[in-house]
């Protein structure tokens, strides 16, 4: 690859985390989120129906995690520095525990990988971030693995 972007200093950043951020989950926020995405599932907006379900009460839609931002670690990419063009390379989600009203969810993102490849427009860098969503009991509720493409 002629135009190498990643250098040793760039690669040393892998594993760094942004500051954790904690959110208090409110019943009204769950209802408004479900309404905004057009999801009428009673688990998300009807306490009585949800109480009768195997969940035993209201829960948040799995995608509710997207409403909880997380500071990402600053990433400096060799020759690109912090100014570059980029694309969203997609996300993979795993869900483990439902999120409930009253939960305190701590969100933290870490730089999981930096990888360089050659594209039609020249060298590209794939940045992989992993975000965890953990409740007040230390239980992992969800993980997100997202990829950004910089060139």
Describe each PLM feature range.
Residues 1-11, 97-151:
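HotDog/MaoC-like acyl-thioester-processing domains
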Residues 88-94, 148:
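A beta-strand/beta-hairpin structural motif
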Residues 2-90:
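Hot-dog-fold acyl-thioester-processing enzymes
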């Amino acid at each position: 690859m002629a135009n190498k972007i990643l250098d040793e200093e760039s690669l040393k950043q892998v594993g760094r985390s942004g500051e954790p951020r904690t959110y208090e989950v409110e019943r009204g926020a769950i209802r408004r989120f479900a309404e905004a995405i057009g999801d009428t599932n009673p688990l998300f907006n009807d306490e009585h129906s949800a109480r009768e379900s195997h969940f035993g009460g209201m829960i948040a839609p799995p995608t509710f995690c997207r409403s909880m931002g997380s500071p990402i670690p600053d990433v400096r990419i060799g020759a690109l520095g912090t100014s570059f063009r980029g694309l969203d390379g997609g996300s993979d989600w795993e869900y483990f525990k439902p999120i409930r009203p009253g939960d305190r969810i701590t969100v933290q993102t870490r730089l999981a990988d930096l990888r360089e490849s050659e594209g039609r427009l020249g060298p590209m860098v794939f940045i992989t971030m992993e975000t965890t969503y953990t409740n007040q009991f230390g239980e992992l509720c969800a993980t997100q693995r997202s990829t950004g493409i910089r060139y």
